[in-house]
UniProtKB/Swiss-Prot annotation:
<feature type="binding site">
    <location>
        <position position="51"/>
    </location>
    <ligand>
        <name>S-adenosyl-L-methionine</name>
    </ligand>
</feature>
<comment type="similarity">
    <text>Belongs to the methyltransferase superfamily. RsmH family.</text>
</comment>
<feature type="binding site">
    <location>
        <position position="75"/>
    </location>
    <ligand>
        <name>S-adenosyl-L-methionine</name>
    </ligand>
</feature>
<feature type="binding site">
    <location>
        <position position="100"/>
    </location>
    <ligand>
        <name>S-adenosyl-L-methionine</name>
    </ligand>
</feature>
<keyword id="KW-0963">Cytoplasm</keyword>
<feature type="binding site">
    <location>
        <begin position="34"/>
        <end position="36"/>
    </location>
    <ligand>
        <name>S-adenosyl-L-methionine</name>
    </ligand>
</feature>
<dbReference type="GO" id="GO:0071424">
    <property type="term" value="F:rRNA (cytosine-N4-)-methyltransferase activity"/>
</dbReference>
<dbReference type="GO" id="GO:0070475">
    <property type="term" value="P:rRNA base methylation"/>
</dbReference>
<dbReference type="InterPro" id="IPR023397">
    <property type="entry name" value="SAM-dep_MeTrfase_MraW_recog"/>
</dbReference>
<keyword id="KW-0489">Methyltransferase</keyword>
<keyword id="KW-0808">Transferase</keyword>
<dbReference type="GO" id="GO:0005737">
    <property type="term" value="C:cytoplasm"/>
</dbReference>
<protein>
    <recommendedName>
        <fullName>Ribosomal RNA small subunit methyltransferase H</fullName>
        <ecNumber>2.1.1.199</ecNumber>
    </recommendedName>
</protein>
<comment type="function">
    <text>Specifically methylates the N4 position of cytidine in position 1402 (C1402) of 16S rRNA.</text>
</comment>
<feature type="binding site">
    <location>
        <position position="93"/>
    </location>
    <ligand>
        <name>S-adenosyl-L-methionine</name>
    </ligand>
</feature>
<keyword id="KW-0698">rRNA processing</keyword>
<dbReference type="InterPro" id="IPR002903">
    <property type="entry name" value="RsmH"/>
</dbReference>
Length: 311
C-alpha cells in the first residue's frame, strides 16, 4: 500500500498539553500511523492505543512491547478495555487521516478513483450502501446536517435520478454527479463534492456519536489530574468538544444540546487548560496545509464524580 506519510497535526502542542510523566499511562484513541504515540513514548509514559482500522497494525511493529499496546476497537470502548480512573492522559485526533485519504482503495477521496467505501474499519455499511438505498429525505439530511451542504436537496435529487440507471460503485462517479448538481465554480478553492463526501463519511462511521461516547468514556477512565486533549478538524466536531468541556467545567449555563442532560448542580469534572482553542502555527501550515482547519482543546480531570445523565 502506498501513501504519502501522515503528518500528525499540532504534535508539539498535544505533547505539551498532555504533560505525560514517566510511569503514566496515556490513551491514544486514534492511533493511525502512530505519530502521537511516538511523540509521547519518549516521556517515559506507556501508551494504550485504539484504532478500528486493522491496517494500522503495521505501524506498531517497532514500538516497545513493554510500554505500548494496540487495541483494535473504537476509542469509545476505552472504558470497557481499561476500567475507571486508570490513566493519566487521553488524546483524540478526530476525523479521517491523510493516510486514509491518500489510499484510493479506502474510498474517502473525491480526487482519486476507488470503491465508494469510506469505512474507517472493516465492518458496517459503506458509502455506496447509503447513496444506493436511502430515500431523498434521508440522503439530503445526511448531506445537510453532517456535510453542512446547502445544496443537499438538489444533490440528493441528482443522485437518485442517476442511480435509477445504475448503482454508484466508485468515488469519482459520485463526485462527478455532485459536481453536475452544484456546478464547479471557476477558481473555487474547495471541490464541489467536499461537503457531501464529509457528510457521507461522518454518517458511515457514526463519527459524531462516537465522539460523544468517547468524551464520556474519557471522563471515566481519567484519574484526577489526568488530561484530555482533543484535536478537531471541522466545526461539527469542535462544537461538540467545546460544549462538552464547557459544560463539564461549569461554564455552560443551560447545558449543551450536543450532550445528554445531566443532573443540576453537579461539581465540575474538568478544568479547562485554556478557554480558547489552540490553532496551528503559520510554520506548521507551511509544512502541512491540511492542518489549516484543526483546533486543539484540552482540560484537566478534577476529583469530582463523573457527571451522570439526568433522570
Amino acid at each position: 500500500m502506498s501513501a504519502a506519510p501522515h503528518i500528525s497535526v499540532l504534535l508539539d502542542e498535544v505533547v505539551e498539553a498532555l504533560d505525560a510523566k514517566p510511569g503514566d499511562v496515556v490513551v491514544d484513541g486514534t492511533f493511525g500511523a502512530g505519530g502521537y504515540t511516538r511523540a509521547v513514548l519518549p516521556t517515559g509514559a506507556s501508551v494504550v492505543a485504539f484504532d478500528r482500522d486493522p491496517t494500522v497494525r503495521q505501524f506498531a511493529a517497532n514500538l516497545p512491547a513493554d510500554r505500548f499496546r494496540l487495541v483494535q476497537a473504537r476509542f469509545s470502548e476505552m472504558l470497557d478495555e481499561l476500567g475507571p480512573e486508570s490513566v493519566e492522559g487521553v488524546m483524540l485526533d478526530l476525523g479521517v487521516s491523510s493516510m486514509q485519504l491518500d489510499q484510493a482503495e479506502r474510498g474517502f477521496s473525491f480526487m482519486r478513483d476507488g470503491p465508494l467505501d469510506m469505512r474507517m474499519g472493516d465492518t458496517g455499511p459503506t458509502a455506496a450502501d447509503l447513496v444506493n438505498t436511502l430515500d431523498h429525505a434521508e440522503l439530503a439530511k445526511i448531506l445537510y446536517v453532517y456535510g453542512e451542504e446547502h445544496a443537499s436537496r438538489r444533490i440528493a435529487s441528482f443522485i437518485l435520478r442517476r442511480r435509477e440507471e445504475r448503482p454508484f460503485e466508485r468515488t469519482l462517479d459520485l463526485a462527478e454527479v455532485i459536481e453536475r448538481a452544484v456546478g464547479g465554480r471557476k477558481g473555487a478553492k474547495v471541490h464541489p463534492a467536499t461537503r457531501s463526501f464529509q457528510g457521507l463519511r461522518i454518517a458511515v462511521n457514526d463519527e459524531l456519536g462516537e465522539l460523544e461516547a468517547g468524551l464520556a468514556a474519557a471522563e471515566r477512565v481519567l484519574k484526577p489530574g489526568g488530561r484530555l486533549v482533543v484535536v478537531t478538524f471541522h466545526s461539527l466536531e469542535d462544537r461538540i468538544v467545546k460544549a462538552f468541556l464547557a459544560e463539564r467545567a461549569g461554564k455552560a449555563p443551560g447545558g449543551s444540546r450536543h450532550a445528554p442532560p445531566v443532573a443540576a448542580g453537579a461539581a465540575p469534572s474538568f478544568q479547562l487548560i485554556s478557554n480558547k482553542a489552540i490553532a496551528p502555527s503559520e510554520a506548521e501550515l507551511a509544512v502541512n496545509p491540511r492542518a489549516r482547519s484543526s483546533k486543539l482543546r484540552a482540560a484537566v480531570r478534577t476529583d469530582a464524580p463523573v457527571w451522570e445523565a439526568a433522570g
